[in-house]
Amino acid sequence: MAKIKLSAISTRAPKKADKEKLKAETEKILVELDELQNRLIAESKHSLLVIIQGMDASGKDGILRDVFGSLNPLGVSVTSFKAPTAEELSHDFLWRVHEAAPAKGMIKIFNRSHYENVLVTRVHPEYILNEHIPGINSVKDIKPSFW
């Protein structure tokens, strides 16, 4: 399997993109994804976690529909992380992430992720108090080394 260096892939669309060519390439990739998913399910040795992170209206739902919509729905599920529920807040910071992790043979897509919480808490450190982190009982307990 080829190694992919994500930092070498531009996040911007090409200026002169040939939409028909891109659609044809996408179709080819979707066929390959279908084959890989079948192997993943059959072997049941590994799982795949895909994290889609982006601002509101950045196209996350379009990616889910256009890329993952062609896969076998029995082998794919999506979890959207919104504001934590009372049950989630009663556990540690990563509990809901671990609860949503994919089983072997499955593909799980996180529509947003716990990484977003890291960014939000830098702006609103008081939110950390809801995460039940040992030794942090007030905002004053959050030392610079925490970040």
Give residue spans per PLM region.
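Glycine-rich phosphate-binding loop of ATP-dependent small-molecule kinases
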Residues: 1-147
